[in-house]
Amino acid sequence: MIPDFTDEGLLLPGAHEATLEELREKLGFSRRRRDLIDGLERALTLMGGCGVRRVYLDGSFVTDKPRPGDIDGCYDVEPGMDLQSMYPIWPLSHLNRARSRAAFGVEFFPADTVEAGSGQPFLQFFQRDREGSPKGVVAMELRGEVR
């Protein structure tokens, strides 16, 4: 369940489980946000087909900002998962990040990959604000069809 935003417009620290429907209800409060959720749904369907089972959402999308630019996120890498199968969807090169933003409105990274600026894995990096204080993310389990 996605909690209410803090006074700072962030989620309480932790990974808050949600379904796509809960995401629509709680975070789809502007046209821009609903458009981003539609792109996210398309992306999650493709990612699920590549073996992704769990994703974490972050960025301005999981704040009270009415018009977030995109959705940032990361996904758990499952044992034996072929990351190359993700290439058509999420090229792991910074040169192609704009393509995933344009196609889906989202940017995803492997959760255990280190974010260069912070030196932390993306999942840890996403759970801190710019000042280093803890904040929340949305966690989604992909089981079969995305719903």
Describe the residue ranges of each PLM region:
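Catalytic core of pol beta-like nucleotidyltransferases
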Residues: 1-54, 58, 62-68, 78-147
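Short hydrophobic/aromatic beta-strand micro-patches
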Residues: 74-76
